[in-house]
A protein has these predicted regions:
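S-adenosylmethionine/decaboxylated-SAM
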Residues: 3-171
């Protein structure tokens, strides 16, 4: 079972609102939209090679949007047009995009963006408040030391799922 299938089994046919941080080419994003008919999902990614925006010290959304996105960004936008009320892509930094979501408004967040310890730590800190009580705080790549350290800083009792998924239910 891969991470998309695992998350889809959690969501099922329930009405749910979620965010995926770090979409890349969109395999998990697309799978969730196709499998979960009552899911509204927003995918957030810079859609620019990290080395480019980091080397050029780009830190604002305005600066980011001036850069030509990677080719698969347009493919994901086209996919979203097939599901106009349920599938949304936002080109932004994860530490900026959180401001567009109300606290307690999400059923889940799936964190799979920048895998540095500092970035994962920041994503959890900024996005966990957006998840409803009883919702899922989750992500990918728990097999990476940087991810594991950040996750353990927030919840030492986290659980693991297939395909290197980590998660906990928000209390």
């Amino acid at each position: 079972m891969n991470r998309g299938q695992w998350l889809a089994s959690y969501i099922g046919n329930n009405k749910a609102v979620g965010v995926e941080l770090g979409v890349l080419r969109g395999p998990t994003f697309k799978a969730l939209i196709k499998i979960c008919p009552n899911l509204t999902l927003t995918g957030i990614d810079v859609f620019t090679p990290d080395r480019y925006w980091q080397a050029n010290k780009i830190t604002t959304t305005e600066e980011l949007l001036k850069i030509q996105p990677l080719s698969w960004f347009d493919e994901l936008l086209e996919f979203c047009r097939e599901y106009p009320y349920r599938a949304h892509i936002r080109r932004d930094f994860t530490n900026k995009a959180h401001a567009n979501f109300e606290d307690g408004s999400l059923d889940f967040v799936f964190i799979d963006a920048d895998h540095s310890m500092e970035a994962v730590d920041e994503d959890i800190r900024l996005w966990e408040p957006k998840v409803k009580k009883g919702g899922l705080v989750s992500g990918h790549d728990i097999d990476m030391l940087s991810v594991k350290m950040a996750v353990m800083n927030h919840n030492p009792q986290y659980e693991e799922g297939p395909d290197n998924v980590w998660y906990w239910k928000k209390e």
